[in-house]
Swiss-Prot record:
It is found in: Membrane. PANTHER family: XANTHINE-URACIL / VITAMIN C PERMEASE FAMILY MEMBER. Belongs to the nucleobase:cation symporter-2 (NCS2) (TC 2.A.40) family. GO terms for cellular component: membrane. Highly expressed in the root central cylinder. Expressed in the filaments and stigmatic papillae of pollinated flowers and developing siliques. InterPro entries: NCS2. This is Nucleobase-ascorbate transporter 4. It is a multi-pass membrane protein. The keyword Transmembrane helix applies. Keywords: Membrane, Transmembrane, Transmembrane helix, Transport. Pfam families: Xan_ur_permease. The gene is NAT4. The keyword Chaperone does not apply. It comes from Arabidopsis thaliana.
Length: 526
């Protein structure tokens, strides 16, 4: 039989990702949307619990303080998610706690001035106030970058070639929170990973699940099955004589968090007292905000793909960064001990479920606010073993990385210039970040150790982020390497994104990114 010519035709380039069930501006029915929103809430719980669990004990807090901080993070995350989806980027992203702020928060926590406080609760409050003050000051620079259009100017020079490493490393850069955390309780984490892959990838093709139920709710089914399995192991005494670290990772009866959580409590601004302000703390926290801006940009680009929207215009992206800065301000006012970012795991969930609806994410924000107020119910869900979340991350982070790989369809991969920029930026991003992170864990300080401790922390924060290092390398090389050659513009894919550089150039932009209530008249995008 003769070979068809179509078999050798290249796959067409798509401005919008096909195969998505619900795009940014469309919505599922309410029952389905509520379940999908609850699923987003469950997925973001892992990061919400991990960061306070690291910081609060070091700050001097106990189970009560940890429960209060977790509920505060949930409450502020719900508000930030609503603000971002309504007035910011308008993309279906969940705004939550960011790992980028861990290093400056630890720098403040271990500051010598807090050693004078002997009472743990008093030391916790004083440390929290210092972190709050640093977040408030850092949020100002964050908002300036967004609302004054400084970030818009920079991202206009992004091409698909330089954006690909950014999005790839936004997903891959968090690999330390995936399988290494799964392996802490392999008998729970590995079954969760296998079940999730079977439910989401194989079962839909074997049984032809109606309306992609297997794909859309695979995360909820996986958590329910493996959590019940973990409950059985815990009740059977499988971990009674195991080391404390194993029990912490595997057991489901972490009663300290549940008993410490109040039935009803509404977080409020300045609940820990008046923030304190120190210049070195603020500069260290500013570095974290810039890293969060970079990583959020990667999540925004991935979310626009998974939501079947057109490429996000620089002005809209900058607007979203500005509202993220307002979110960091709220983090500082309420006292969450960390800033906000677009959560990578929830962005990956858009790809897994093929549901990029804005309404679903807004519903998830409602769950965040509800469970933050009624703390006992939220604490029960927060007791899900962390290796189960790590199993989810193995798939969800990979989806975000795949969104970055998808941008390469706009580029000429036969160009040796492109091969070098792509390969080098990904490699150097992972390599430098791993070096800085390992150096910190082995020696207790970063490789940069000058007399100015704040500068050392700034360098550690920036170069511990694979996405930040990768985009710096890719952006610099793409804008300087053979830039004057006639073929470079097409090879890097700039001509594909040219029509999205200005807001009104493409008619589809208004459908996905226009502000509600006709607010574009008063706050125009350019």
């Amino acid at each position: 039989m003769a070979t068809k010519t179509d078999d050798f035709a290249p796959f067409p380039v798509k401005d919008q990702l096909p195969g998505v069930e619900f795009c940014v501006s469309s919505s599922p029915n309410w029952p389905e949307g509520i379940v999908l929103g609850f699923q987003h809430y469950i997925v973001m719980l892992g990061t919400t619990v991990i960061i306070p669990s690291i910081l609060v004990p070091l700050m001097g807090g106990g189970d009560v303080e940890k429960a209060e901080v977790i509920n505060t993070v949930l409450f502020v995350s719900g508000i930030n998610t609503l603000l971002q989806s309504l007035f910011g980027s308008r993309l279906p992203v969940v705004m939550g706690a960011s790992y980028a702020y861990l290093i400056p928060a630890l720098y403040i926590t271990f500051s010598y001035r807090f050693t004078y406080y002997l009472h743990p609760h008093l030391r916790f409050e004083e440390t929290m106030r210092a972190i709050q003050g640093a977040l408030i000051i850092a949020s100002i620079s964050h908002m300036i970058m967004g609302f004054f259009g400084l970030w818009r100017i920079l991202v206009r020079f992004l091409s698909p070639l330089s954006a690909a490493p950014l999005v790839i490393l936004t997903g891959v850069g968090l690999l330390a929170f995936a399988f290494p955390q799964l392996a802490r309780c392999i008998e729970i984490g590995l079954p969760a990973l296998i079940i999730l892959i079977i439910l989401s990838q194989y079962l839909p093709h074997l049984f032809k699940c109606k309306r992609s139920i297997c794909e859309q709710f695979a995360v909820l089914f996986t958590i329910a099955i493996v959590w019940a399995y973990a409950e059985i192991l815990t009740a059977a005494g499988a971990y009674d004589k195991r080391p404390d670290n194993t029990q912490l990772s595997c057991r489901t009866d972490r009663s300290g968090l549940i008993s410490a959580s109040p039935w009803v409590r509404i977080p409020y601004p300045l609940q820990w007292g008046r923030p304190s302000f120190h210049g070195s703390d603020a500069f260290a926290m500013m570095a974290a905000t810039y890293v969060a801006i970079v990583e959020t940009t990667g999540s925004f680009i991935a979310a626009s793909r998974f939501g079947s929207a057109t490429h996000i215009p620089p002005s809209v992206l900058s607007r979203g960064i500005g509202w993220q800065g307002i979110g960091v301000l709220l983090n500082g006012l309420f006292g969450t001990a960390t800033g906000s970012t677009a959560l990578v795991e929830n962005t990956g969930l858009l790809g897994l479920t093929k549901v990029g609806s804005r309404r679903v994410v807004q519903i998830s924000a409602g769950f965040m606010i509800f469970f933050s107020i009624f703390g006992k119910f939220g604490a029960v869900l927060a007791s899900i073993p962390l290796p189960i979340f790590a199993a989810l991350y193995c798939v969800l982070f990979a989806y975000v990385a795949s969104a970055g790989l998808g941008l390469l369809q706009f580029c000429n991969l036969n160009s040796f210039r492109n091969k070098f920029i792509l390969g080098f930026s990904i490699f150097i991003g992972l390599s430098v970040a791993q070096y800085f992170t390992e150096y910190l864990f082995i020696s207790g300080r970063g490789p940069v150790h000058t007399r100015t401790s704040a500068f050392n922390v700034i360098m550690q924060v920036i170069f511990s982020s694979a996405a930040t290092v990768g985009i710096m390398a890719a952006f610099l090389l793409d804008c300087t390497h053979s830039y004057g050659h006639a073929s470079v513009r097409r090879d890097s894919g700039r001509h594909w994104w040219e029509k999205f550089r200005v807001y009104h150039t493409d008619t589809r932009t208004e459908e996905f990114y226009a502000l509600p209530y006709n607010l574009n008249r008063f706050f125009p995008s350019f």
